[in-house]
Design a protein with these regions (language model features):
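S-adenosylmethionine
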Residues: 1-278
Length: 278
């Protein structure tokens, strides 16, 4: 297995996303500074804000009042690559705790239908709380196992699969990962789970729709090799380049784009955007 990177992502700052229902990223920076944040400025990813707080961001009145949510810049980039639009039907198949779902519904202008799924009620409750705090009306948190067909899910214009993974790209945030041995059986289980969720997404996506697969690992078996295997099973899909500009240092290849913290300043992260051609 590849070792992860313990490099501190986002310059050691907290990466945020402004709630467009309450103002622009620039206005959020002003409010953060006025409320006691040490620093607040635009980040690398369009619409992101990097801030330094005296304590936890969750202690901020602006957080409690739904002015922003916390989401790493690399994670924001993955959600932006979905290119969700107002009026779309969008699925977020591995949505908890809900940060990417919030960004998706922001991109949709809180118009259309976003179904945000996760495997347990406890995890779905995290999504509900985040959506309620931010004040969005068109998000449907739902318990659903992405590895299995779910007849209650709608056909979608776009789908995000931020898959369960080994987490080797975020050691700075979760250093305990480095002390956990990822045995071959567990690694194989992760690969099978990722594969099953991708197959579920393929069946739920409309022709012409966008599928984004992402992980917070740098392991090729979970990233480029997983995408290559998916494309071999599903020749109706092709890799596409999203409209959003990738930050400097991203490695872009045939089967996706990789962020390595020491090169991009963001978390270790992988994403691949695909289109269903028929």
């Amino acid at each position: 297995m590849l070792l992860g990177y313990a490099h501190t992502a986002d310059g050691g700052l907290t990466s945020l996303r402004a709630n467009p229902l309450k103002g622009t990223p620039e206005a959020l920076c002003e409010k953060l500074l006025a409320s006691g944040a040490k620093t607040a400025a635009p980040g690398l990813v369009p619409g992101s804000v990097l801030a330094r707080f005296e304590g936890s961001p969750a202690e901020s009145g602006l957080f409690r009042d739904g002015y922003f949510h916390v989401e790493g810049q690399a994670s924001q980039l993955a959600a932006l690559c979905v290119e969700a639009k107002p009026g779309d039907t969008v699925l977020d198949l591995c949505a908890a705790p809900g940060g990417k779902s919030l960004l998706l519904i922001e991109e949709m202008g809180d118009e259309g239908r976003l179904v945000s799924c996760d495997v347990s009620e406890n995890r779905v409750q995290l999504i509900r709380k985040a959506v309620e705090r931010m004040g969005f009306a068109h998000v449907e948190p739902r318990v659903s196992d992405g590895t299995k067909a779910d007849a209650d899910l709608p056909m979608a214009d776009a789908i995000l699969v931020d898959a369960p993974c080994s987490g080797l790209g975020i050691l700075a945030k979760k250093p305990d990962i480095r002390y956990k041995t990822l045995e071959k059986a567990r690694h194989d289980e992760l690969l099978a789970t990722q594969s099953s969720i991708l197959d579920t997404a393929a069946a739920l996506l409309k022709a012409g729709g966008r599928l984004v697969y992402s992980t917070c690992t740098i392991d090729p078996a979970e990233n480029e090799e997983q995408v290559a295997a998916f494309l071999a099973r599903h020749p109706e899909f092709r890799v596409v380049r999203p409209a959003v500009a990738f930050p400097d240092g991203m490695t872009v290849g045939e089967h996706g784009a990789l962020s390595v913290p020491t090169r991009t300043g963001m978390d270790g992260f992988f994403l691949c955007a695909m289109q269903k051609t028929q």
